[in-house]
Each structure stands twice: as C-alpha cells, then as structure tokens.
C-alpha cells in the first residue's frame, strides 16, 4: 500500500482545517507547530523532510495538546536535542507516551508501519523496552476507554481512506515489533 504525503495532508485538512483553523504542511529539516499569527492566518503543523511517519508523529502531538497549548509555538513543550543523558531520556519518554500511542493507532488505521522513536541517536537511550511497553499500555487504555474526539475523527478518516478495519483491534498491536 502506498502512503502519499498528499493523502495524509488532504485527510488531515478535511478533518480539521475548518473547525480548528489548522493545516498539515510539508516542512523542512525539523518539524514545528506554529499557531496562527499576523503573517500566517492559520495554525500550521509542519512535519519533517516529507516523511509520512513524521506527519503522523506531529499530528499526534497536536491531538494531545489542549486548547491553550495549541496557542503556543510547539505547544510550549521543552525539547532537549539529541544527545540526552539516560536520565534526561527518561524525562523525554514520559511526555512521549501518549503522542506515540496515538501515532501507533493512526499508523495502524492507515496500514502504515509504526516504530517507537526515542529520538536520541547520539545519546544513551538506555533500555527502550519499558518505554515501548508504556506506549502499548496507553494504546490499550485508548482501546478500552476510547480516543479523544479529534483523535477518533482522524483515526476513522484514515481507516476509511485506507480500507482498514474501523476500530482499534489490539491484536494488531505487537510491542515486540516496534
């Protein structure tokens, strides 16, 4: 199955451009979220380097962000660049569990392979298995309790577009493969 950038952009924008004044945009080397301002009259989620996986990841951060955070550049999150110590890596992973669980759910709805990202290629990521397990546990929680409204809207749209099953089937989530 081919995953075109034009498709994920169109699907996202159809779901959210009108109600949330938010667009998904192919960006450059680094992803960033920029709220509407004097120069750009809409909120923009810029994903990196034309990667479908980056689009899903940045969308997931937008889906987690509440109304007030969506008014801030990059949702007001701290970001420590690649090369983090193992301790700082654990802090980073704590804020990544929910977005990555949503990313995995969206990827599965689109028939796209998800890989957990610790985003620390030049540092010491340590044992990543606890992080992957935490992401899986969050997927289970979402499957049992339901997704937030915006996440469910997009999950449903992706499943319809890609002809996937229109539910979160935990049998399709294998923590050993991420």
Stretch-by-stretch model annotation:
Residues 1-4, 38-54, 89:
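Short pre-active-site segment immediately N-terminal to the catalytic Zn-binding motif
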Residues 1-22, 155-174:
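A metal-dependent hydrolase signature that marks the N-terminal structural subdomain at the beginning
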Residues 14, 19-42, 123-126:
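Catalytic zinc-binding patch centered on the HExxH motif and its immediate surroundings
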Residues 53-67:
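Active-site recognition of the HExxH zinc-binding catalytic motif
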Residues 64-97, 115-125:
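Post-HEXXH active-site segment of zinc metalloproteases
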Residues 93-108:
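An active-site-proximal "capping" alpha-helix that borders the catalytic cofactor pocket
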Residues 106-118:
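Substrate-binding/catalytic groove segments of enzymes
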Residues 118-178:
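Pan-zinc metallopeptidase signature
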